[in-house]
Each structure stands twice: as C-alpha cells, then as structure tokens.
C-alpha cells in the first residue's frame, strides 16, 4: 500500500484546532452561565435558531420554566435571553460541525483507500468518542434542569476531561503521522512527561470541580487563601474525603497545590531535558501559573479564566509533544506513514 497522504494529517490538524476552539468556547459558555439557556436537546433538528418573534418568545418561556429561569433570571426579556442563548447555540453548533468534520472526511478517505489498517480503528474511535462527548454534554445540561439552577460539577468535570482527552488523542495521531526523525530515545524524559501529562489531567479535574462549585470566588488572595495557608473549613463536611470534591474551599486548596507541583515538575523536566520542546513546556507552565494567579486575584475574570483553561490545554499539547519525541521510533508498516 501507499503511504497515507499528507491530506489526512492536515485534516486531523484541523480537527484538533476545532476541538481546541470548542474547549475555549465551552469555557466562555460556562463562565457566562449560558449553558442552561437551551432546555431541549435536538441533535438532528437543532441546527437552526428560533426564527421570528413568536419562536423566540416560545424559547424564552421554556427557559423561564427551568430552574435557572425561575430562580435566577426570572425577569429576563427577549434581548437578555438572546445574549445567553447565542453562546450556547454556537457551542452546540460547533460540536455538530466537529462531528461532520470528522465523519465526512473519514468516509471519503476510507472509501478512496487512503487510510492504513493501523489508522482506521483509531479514527473510528475518535468518531465514536466524539458522539459520546455530545451525549455527555446533554447529560451535564440535564442535571441543571431538574431542581437547581446549576449543572452537576461532576458531570461538568467529566465533560471537560473527555473533550481534552479527545483533543490530546487527536494531537497524538497528528504526531504519529508526522516526522519520525524528530524522535530521540530518552526513556527518562518519556516517563517524566507521561507522569506530568497524567498530573495535568488531575489538575484540570480539580479546576473543573472548582468551576462547577464556583469556588474560585471564595478566596481571592495569593499565595495565601484569605490570609491562611490552611484556611478554616477544609474538613467541615463528613465524611472527611467528601471535602475533596464538594467543599469549595478544599477544592480550591487542592487545585492550587496540585498546580504548584505540576509547574515545579515541568520546570525540572525542562531543566534536565534541555530540549526546545521541554523548554517550551517550562515557559508555558510559568505562563499558566501566572494566568491562574491572575484569575484568582481578579475574582475569576471571564477573560482570564478562559485564557487559563486555554493555557492548560496548550501546556498539555506541549507535554504531549515532549513525550512523543522522547519515545523511541517504532517500526511501522509503510501504510501507516504520511507521504509528503
């Protein structure tokens, strides 16, 4: 068989970029509390927004009957409703476009014989997981349509982590189809990068829990938390371990210290590896730390919090490159490689 065309790799680069934008858009949707503005899930027929004043009024009435509409925004008029509706609509629309951007080229490349046996199941997995991500997104929204005007912070974390995992998986496929001569066999760096990638996901988990609990606004000082290194109330819930997930103060405390260990670990990796991609990871870790501190000090500014989430994904991207390049190149059939 012939090598996989460069068009396949370019397609996956576009998909990765679309997922990255989706993660940023999701952050904006959450921070502006727009995610509960659409109270129905229409995966097939939901491509078009309301058309005409009557349709908009009907959509507003549905929203006002939801917990958020009744308890938080009960005085909303059409114009105020549109401000939160459009962001959630764009978020859902972009998800559908990602689905098409994966499914249609996948079918074309498959039927035209341009995909290798090595790549086919991996791309099918990407498509299936993308569909599951859409369903998980609705499950998250549905949790805020029952009796409280907010979504489950557990489902919020799961939704974000799956999106980030899909992005990282796509980036890995791009790297696998790229230049293999950039690789160098460095088992120590590979193991450290693997551990730091895992820690990045853990830090992002507590960041998502922090966002879902709105815990970022509870302590807006740094390096202490309202003047305390160990703020009161860390273990006020019983059993004690539930504080790690449901106590806003504890969740912020854990997120801060996990992030500190992550930044320290990345800086050590950069200092020891001394390679361009490792140094870039170190620089990005410092930037991300600065964004996190600024987000806290500003009481969770929407712009800074969005950049902070984007920064986490960029750090993960660079660490993925570090790990890939530190992994010894494995022999692979010619059909798994990119031509050009």
Predicted regions and their residues:
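Polytopic transmembrane helical bundles with strong interfacial aromatic enrichment
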Residues: 1-340
